[in-house]
Amino acid sequence: MNIRATRVGEQMKKELSDIIGRKLKDPRIGFVTVTDVRVTGDLQQAKVYISVFGDDEQRENTLKALEKAKGFIRSEIGQRIRLRKTPEILFEIDETIEYGSRIERLIRQISDEDGRDSEEVNDEPKNG
């Protein structure tokens, strides 16, 4: 990704957060965070990564609502960011936050188990 595509992606991320949070009134859209926007070098496509607070059904409903509102979102982006052609928007669920949380839970679980194992070793009577 070139510098211009990166800058356009960052600007789109800010604008998309505002549009999704304030302009869209669809009740299917839950608590959404735009985590990243990757724009192709020719500025024709923008892959928008979102994180949705909720279960799998909530994520699916939010994704459907965003797909339905894609035309409105794209026209809003076109009005806010001056480009020759507004990039086509593709929404994807960002799994990295959930993956990170899962790894953190596993590490905490292992740490707790190690703590209990060391307590059991310390509780054994000492021969002295």
From Swiss-Prot:
Which InterPro entries does this entry report, sorted A to Z?
KH_dom-like_a/b (IPR015946), RbfA (IPR000238), RbfA_dom_sf (IPR023799), Ribosome-bd_factorA_CS (IPR020053)
Q: What PROSITE patterns has UniProt attached to this entry?
A: RBFA
- Among the record's GO biological process terms, what is one? maturation of SSU-rRNA
| Molecular function via GO | ribosomal small subunit binding
Q: Which cysteines are joined by disulfide bonds?
A: none
Output the superkingdom of the source species: Bacteria
Q: Name one GO cellular component term.
A: cytosol
Q: Where in the cell is it found?
A: Cytoplasm
Kindly state which keywords UniProt assigns to this record, in alphabetical order: Cytoplasm, Ribosome biogenesis
HAMAP family recorded: RbfA (MF_00003)
Subunit details:
Monomer. Binds 30S ribosomal subunits, but not 50S ribosomal subunits or 70S ribosomes.
- Member of which family? Belongs to the RbfA family.
Role this protein plays: One of several proteins that assist in the late maturation steps of the functional core of the 30S ribosomal subunit. Associates with free 30S ribosomal subunits (but not with 30S subunits that are part of 70S ribosomes or polysomes). Required for efficient processing of 16S rRNA. May interact with the 5'-terminal helix region of 16S rRNA.
Please state what the protein is called.
Ribosome-binding factor A
| Organism listed in the record | Geobacillus thermodenitrificans (strain NG80-2)
Gene that encodes the chain: rbfA
